[in-house]
Each structure stands twice: as C-alpha cells, then as structure tokens.
Design a protein with these regions (language model features):
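Short, Lys/Arg-rich flexible segments
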Residues: 1-74, 78-166
Length: 166
C-alpha cells in the first residue's frame, strides 16, 4: 500500500494571508484617504488645513486600518455645525467666533443675524478675524469616500487575498 505523507503548511499559509491582509489594508486605507482629501473643501476654516491632514494608520497586529484627521475642524467638516449639523443637534441661532479661538466658551452668546454681523464687524475693526455664523453645512468627505469606494475595495480585497492564496 502506498504511503501518504502529510505536510503541514498552515504556518506558511497563515503568514501569506497576514502579509496579503497588511498589503491590502495599506492599499485600501491609502485610497480611502486620497478620496477623502479630494472630497474635502479647501481651507474652509481659516487657518485649519483639514484637507492636508487626513492620514491613515495600519495596526498590523490587529489587522485594522484607521483613517482620520487630528483637527477638530475635520469633525465640523464631516458633521456640520449649528443649524446645519447633520443630526440637527447643533447650536440654534447666530453667534460670533474668532478664528484661532477654536474651543467654544460655556457662556456662548447667541444673537440676531444683524447683531452678530455688527459684532463681527467691530471685532474685525479691532484686528481680529471674526465671523458671524449660524453654522456650516456638513460636507461628509470621509463618509462620501467610503460610500463611493466600498464596492471597489471589497472587490480589491477579494483579488489581493485570492492572488496570494494561489
């Protein structure tokens, strides 16, 4: 009777699968980041370069990729502010903000449109970069990027993982 010999390739297969996953995560997160940058508005928030601060990070141990932006303004860009906030949970009414003073005060005052514009004009006359607003509409650059790339990224994952496993 012929002798059957079993060769355990599970370690090599697991390593190849892990390498394929890591390569794919870098590719997918890089593409998602690039599309998010393209979807972002050019310097909407004065000194904040939201567009130029989108980055991705791959945790090779967890086989996870994260796309994000360290700027608080990226949150505003994604979800909107004030009366235009995506979940309708923003401030209501007009307020004045000074560029560079990003953290809202707990005693934030609200005004009529006319009052807010007059106060902003006065502050600008004092050399401050002041603006009257009732909010900013959400742009959703990350959400739009994910939505537009989801099917492509799934197909690409199948290609990359399938090619490495042959």
């Amino acid at each position: 009777m012929p002798r059957v010999e079993f060769t355990d390739n599970s370690v090599a297969v697991k390593e190849a699968l892990e390498e394929a996953c890591i390569a794919y995560l870098h590719e997918a997160a890089g593409e998602l980041t690039s599309q998010t940058v393209r979807n972002s508005r050019a310097v909407k928030y004065g000194r904040h370069d939201v567009r130029g601060n989108w980055k991705y990070q791959v945790d090779e141990n967890k086989l996870e990729a994260t796309v994000g932006n360290p700027l608080e303004a990226a949150y505003w860009e994604e979800l909107g502010t004030g009366e235009y906030a995506l979940n309708k949970d923003g401030r209501k009414g007009w307020w004045v903000y000074v560029e560079g003073n990003d953290t809202p005060r707990s005693n934030q005052k609200y005004y009529t449109e006319k009052e807010a514009k007059e106060i902003a004009a006065f502050l600008r006359s004092q050399g401050l970069d002041a603006h009257a607003t009732k909010g900013t509409e959400p742009n959703r650059p990350l959400y739009k990027a994910f939505k537009s790339l989801k099917a492509v990224l799934i197909r690409r994952a199948e290609e990359v993982l399938g090619a490495r496993m042959k």
